[in-house]
Amino acid sequence: MSFRDLRECIDSERGMEDVGLAAGRSQREKKRSYKDLLREEEEIAEQVRKSSKKRSRELDLFLASESHKKKKKHLTDDYHADTPSPDLAKKKKKALLPSPAPPSSSDTAMDLLKAITSPQVDTSTTHLPKKPEKILATPVNFSSPSQSSHKEHHKKIGEVSGDDSSHRSKKSKPLTLREPDGLRMKLILSPNEKSEEESASPQGGPGHSEGASSKKTSKKTGREETESRSSHKKHKKESHTPRSGGTPDSASSTGGELEAGELIIDDSFHEMKKKKKSKKSKKKKDKHKDEKHRKHSKSKREHEGEERPTQIASPVLPSPPPPTATTPTSPPSVPPQALITHAEEQLDKKKKKEDPEKPKKKNMSAYQVFSKEYRGSIIAEHPGIDFGELSKKLAEVWKQLPEKDKLAWKQKAQYLQHKQNKAEATTVKRKSSSSESAARSKGSSSGLPSPNKKSPTSVVSFSTSPAKVPDTEPIDVAAHLQLLGESLSLIGHRLQETEGMVAVSGSLSVLLDSILCALGPLVCLTSHVPQLNACPKQILSNTLDNIAYVMPGL
């Protein structure tokens, strides 16, 4: 026992060690996977940093190259400005007409401000009247006032643009600004783009040359964006930018806007046409729906009108009280014959409506019978013959026939017509007998006497009062036997017309029904013989009522 215990302990320890090893492996694998994820995230972050650094370097290089070009141009302009001519002085005066005071040689800062606010900011040639060497020697002093004034100007423009954007949505009037064309184009830009342009422009660097280059790039981008917007925004009134009388760029932009306006008118016209078409189609659909709904409602009304008489004819009348001496004197509250006649009138109307829809069957002529039988032989002689040629040949053969043959064909046609008429009559009788049996069943359930078939000897003494039970008098018995005789004679005629054998099951059922219908009324006669009067009157009257269900028929 001790050896087994030791072995079990060793096995359990080994199992625990295996479990511990498995847990350690899973933890190591988890740590490795987590480390791999961290490494991948670090690599992605490094790639993003590298790409952003590359972009910033490319932008710096682009700005530096542009600023270098602008510096060269500025130096050449300054060199030419050292030797002023009378023509140049006149041009300067014309350019500086919007400024309030004439330029002076001493106030360089004022001249710079006027040059910035003048309409010739687009051109890079800002001609300074005198002392170019001092300005070149001290670039820091020159850049500080210009940059500060430029920033203030930007702030003012931002405020004005914010107000104008809020007013543009309410009114579609064009703005009239006093600033030159470049600043006007800046007003159209969104505040986000302005902030991007301001961040892109270098702050406190090489001075006026870099500021001018950033201004030019921002102007170009602003013009391109406004042109693209004016072409894209067709359905907005804000796309019509204000025009300041000046540069050819503004004229071209206004021309583009006019073209866009024309396109807008065309598009709106097409949209109006489409809307009109859609409205017309909707109206047509609504009309069709209304017509369908009307037809459906009419058919429903007709159906309800047809169902109402049947519902009127079948209300359950009060159960008949026990037979007393005072029952014949009680007047009926609702005459049932009136209800039945109303139902019959409705059925007649329905039949009259259905009759014109059904095609009337024409009488069979001798020529029709002859052509029906002789057509097959002609087709066998001439296969693939046309209908017109076939009818011509049939007419020729009919003309050549002697009178005896024609008479034979006429007799045959008459016989066929008679047969057809008989078949139709039997089908009509069947329908009428089924309707009468249904009416009888309703009468028996409500305590009414069953309506009998028309016959010369059937003189029924049933009263119209619903409370009276059917009588078992000899006249009633005779009426029932007459009905049985009529039905059996009709069955006999039909059997004579049929060619071939008759089913045994059908004949047996007819015989059984006829025996029951004959014995029922005969049993009622026992009530008049005192020695045989053992059956109560109620049972006899019920048997006479139920004969309608057992009446034989094929």
From Swiss-Prot:
Role, per record: Negatively regulates Wnt/beta-catenin signaling during development.
Residue ranges under compositional bias (Low complexity)? Answer: 434-466
* Major subcellular location class: nucleus
The answer on whether this UniProt entry bears the keyword DNA-binding reads yes
Point out the DNA-binding stretch(es).
Answer: 360-428
GO CC terms: nucleus
Report the gene name.
hmgxb4
Organism field = Xenopus tropicalis (Western clawed frog)
Q: Where is the composition biased (Basic and acidic residues)?
A: 221-230, 342-358
Subunit structure comment from the entry: Interacts with nlk.2.
Q: Compositionally biased, Basic residues: which spans?
A: 272-300
Which portions of the sequence form the region Disordered? Answer: 14-34, 47-368, 418-468
Indicate whether Hydrolase appears among the record's keywords: no
Its domain of life reads Eukaryota
Name-wise, this protein is HMG box-containing protein 4
The biased composition feature labelled Pro residues covers: 317-335
Any Pfam family the entry gives? HMG_box
Where is there biased composition of kind Polar residues?
117-127, 242-255
